[in-house]
Design a protein with these regions (language model features):
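Transmembrane-helix boundary and interhelical linker motifs in polytopic inner-membrane proteins
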Residues: 2, 33-37, 51-86, 133-139
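A general secondary-structure boundary signal
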Residues: 4, 8, 56, 80, ...
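Hydrophobic transmembrane helix module of multi-pass membrane transport proteins
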Residues: 88-162
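Short amphipathic alpha-helical segments, especially helix-boundary/capping motifs
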Residues: 1-5, 24-26, 38-44, 77, ...
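Hydrophobic faces of transmembrane alpha-helices in multi-pass small-molecule transporters and flippases
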Residues: 1-24, 85, 89, 114, ...
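Signature of the first transmembrane helix
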Residues: 3-60, 100, 153
Length: 162
């Protein structure tokens, strides 16, 4: 029960952070970038998001379920992790290649932003949050994600000027 309470607290803190950061960033970015750049960002992000969805393709849910069932059997746990992560890497590689082909062939006017969005796709490919959720180590995932969100926010304020 103690572990469940800690995991719940970690999750609540992270969810609050997920609501606060956009609340702070949206007005700043809207004023700084303007309507055109916000629209271009939203458009290009929606494209990369489809490729991220294909990369993960239910792996988060399946991974948590499979890992939580095998977390006490080390040999089976390693095998489960390898097979799930191998599938994620395979789908991610296909997505990365397809995304860059689409970016070059069909969307060359937005190529620079689409190239930068490769970072989102790569982060989805290497993301193993499902493993840590499966072994009930919420603190690792929440701490890492919170640090990334806070650093990203600080970098946006420092680097996005005009």
């Amino acid at each position: 029960m103690k572990n469940l309470s800690k995991n719940l607290i970690y999750n609540i803190i992270y969810q609050v952070l997920l609501y606060i950061i956009p609340f702070i960033l949206t007005p700043y970015l809207s004023r700084t970038l303007g309507v055109t750049q916000i629209g271009e960002y939203s458009y290009t992000y929606s494209i990369v998001y489809y490729f991220m969805l294909f990369t993960l393709l239910g792996i988060n849910n399946y991974g948590v379920r499979k890992i939580s069932k095998t977390k006490h059997k080390k040999d089976v746990l390693g095998e489960a992790f390898s097979s799930i992560y191998g599938l994620q890497l395979f789908l991610g590689l296909i997505s990365l290649i397809a995304y860059n082909l689409v970016s070059v062939v069909f969307l060359s006017t937005h190529y620079t932003i689409l190239l930068i969005h490769n970072l989102f796709l790569i982060s989805a490919i290497v993301d193993i949050n499902w493993f840590f959720f499966g072994i009930e180590k919420f603190n690792i995932t929440v701490t890492r994600n919170a640090v990334i969100k806070i650093l990203s926010t600080l970098l946006i304020f420092l680097l996005v000027k005009n």
